[in-house]
């Protein structure tokens, strides 16, 4: 273990009480791991808890959240997005803490006209401040089959992944005065809702309600993570690989290829938005 990893591990031990160990959750069922929080019946758990669907119509969307809160971990979920003309809809899938100074790790999938590519929107909030958007066109049809969308969150960095391919990294640069999510536990949330005022072509394309209900599907949830409860966090026995995991050269190369080919917006290159200079993290 190198010095920086040792120091981060020590800080983690001091700030997170690990008095109770638990086994990681593998492919937890939706009826035991999640609560459907809104939608008046538009969210459904099916197939003995193995499948969850969210629906949106003109009256309402729907959403769910995990029963547990996590403080660091590797979170995986398979999603199949709204097919056909999904313009104006947003499928949000994200980790978020409570309060006015919340932390958040955010996937949003912006609906499209039939035949156009989906836009995958990512963002990181720290202490209630976001404005760190990166957007991608997916290199496959995310409505034809299930694909895995993952977040790796440890003391070193946050990594967004699609089918185990890293697409974005947000590093812990607290030594530069940049806030990093490390103290506030987060739940996993997802929702399907109407955002046609901005979601598709900046709001030019509105939701076609004749195509409703719109439906997104979820399966194969996995959380290999530290579970927070009552101010204490319980972590997997042993030394979980994800806790000290960094991107190796192969993973970095894959991420650069995705960013070069499929990234359509990066706040770190938006000179109109930041005429006085980019945020400090953009240099790393």
UniProtKB/Swiss-Prot annotation:
EC number: 2.4.1.207
Residues annotated to bind xyloglucan: 108, 121-123, 131-133, 197-198, 202, 273
A GO MF label: hydrolase activity, hydrolyzing O-glycosyl compounds
PTM info: Contains at least one intrachain disulfide bond essential for its enzymatic activity.
Cystine residue pairs: 226-235, 268-282
Catalysis performed (reactions): breaks a beta-(1->4) bond in the backbone of a xyloglucan and transfers the xyloglucanyl segment on to O-4 of the non-reducing terminal glucose residue of an acceptor, which can be a xyloglucan or an oligosaccharide of xyloglucan
Annotated protein name in UniProt: Probable xyloglucan endotransglucosylase/hydrolase protein 25
Organism, as annotated: Arabidopsis thaliana
Gene name per UniProt: XTH25
